[in-house]
Amino acid sequence: MSNGIVIIGSGFAARQLVKNIRKQDASIPLTLIAADSMDEYNKPDLSHVISQGQRADDLTRQTAGEFAEQFNLRLFPHTWVTDIDAEAHVVKSQNNQWQYDKLVLATGASAFVPPVPGRELMLTLNSQQEYRACETQLRDARRVLIIGGGLIGSELAMDFCRAGKMVTLIDNAASILASLMPPEVSSRLQHRLTEMGVHLLLKSQLQGLEKTDSGILATLDRQRCIEVDAVIAATGLRPETALARRAGLTINRGVCVDSYLQTSNADIYALGDCAEINGQVLPFLQPIQLSAMVLAKNLLGNNTPLKLPAMLVKIKTPELPLHLAGETQRQDLRWQINTERQGMVARGVDDADQLRAFVVSEDRMKEAFGLLKTLSM
């Protein structure tokens, strides 16, 4: 490979791929291009920065320069890729272009911001860069409104509450974590958030935001209003597919790839939050780690299909942490819930009494690995 591998992106997926490639090949040319600084940070830490009093710069684990030196890379930070000429094997920015033999899209996903009047007043916490832009406002805010009661929204609500702020969480579902599990399973965490002082406005919808002299006025449905100092959108992520679309690749929710992480173009691959693997978008660390291991082999000619095992998803709510696995969102499961002082074990079984999903909390999270072994896939 005279031109080597070009990777667009510098997040967790890109870094895992670089590390796995370098374990097998120390000299193949590797080029990374990204719009950010390319400094390394741990993205899940963003759910806890406020209670821990961390600034954006405190999150940096390794600078871009250190990364380049350690892994023998060419890095192009603060660079927006504008186009991909798949036929000519060329990646283009406004001022530069790079030839590639193999190209990897690791462009991640962007936070979805609800399209309501005043949406420009909403903050997002999907990157170190986004936190840097709003850290002063968030640190100074006394009253915080979080839009979305999913995984990130629940983590942020608890963190801001632990930092002593008045927190309101709004979601149009009837319970928190509604896309991940039924209400009878999420109720333990929901009750804990309420106990801590989080004001939950469920079955509610944001209509608009307006700047006032004393803060931000949020208008909700049923003619309700609330004034706050900061509004955070935690309403899910959308895979970044614009570049792939311009390159003529097949797109669905994400960039469509097969079990080899290969797109509809034989020399272009996708990895991480932007990828849709055989119809599934999996924006969690473990599938990204496993995908990066497989993709490194495939890029170097050792074709290996990705086989994902049953995997844990961790909800980092320190006052009541949860681990879950399996098809927790399935509507046809029968849930067997055992609750004790030290925690909860909820088992979701199908009509044949096969374990299809589980959720464990607190001290009973240690039972997760045993349950994983009995999970039917």
Swiss-Prot record:
Catalytic activity as recorded in UniProt: 2 reduced [nitric oxide reductase rubredoxin domain] + NAD(+) + H(+) = 2 oxidized [nitric oxide reductase rubredoxin domain] + NADH
Principal EC category: oxidoreductase
Transmembrane regions listed in the UniProt entry: none
Cofactor section: FAD
Key words of the record: Cytoplasm, FAD, Flavoprotein, NAD, Oxidoreductase
Family: Belongs to the FAD-dependent oxidoreductase family.
InterPro entries reported in the protein's UniProt record: FAD-bd_OxRdtase (IPR050260), FAD/NAD-bd_sf (IPR036188), FAD/NAD-binding_dom (IPR023753), NO_rdtase_NorW (IPR023961), Rbx-bd (IPR041364)
Pathway: Nitrogen metabolism; nitric oxide reduction
Subcellular location as annotated: Cytoplasm
Organism lineage string: Bacteria, Pseudomonadati, Pseudomonadota, Gammaproteobacteria, Enterobacterales
This protein's name: Nitric oxide reductase FlRd-NAD(+) reductase
Originating species: Escherichia coli O81 (strain ED1a)
Function: One of at least two accessory proteins for anaerobic nitric oxide (NO) reductase. Reduces the rubredoxin moiety of NO reductase.
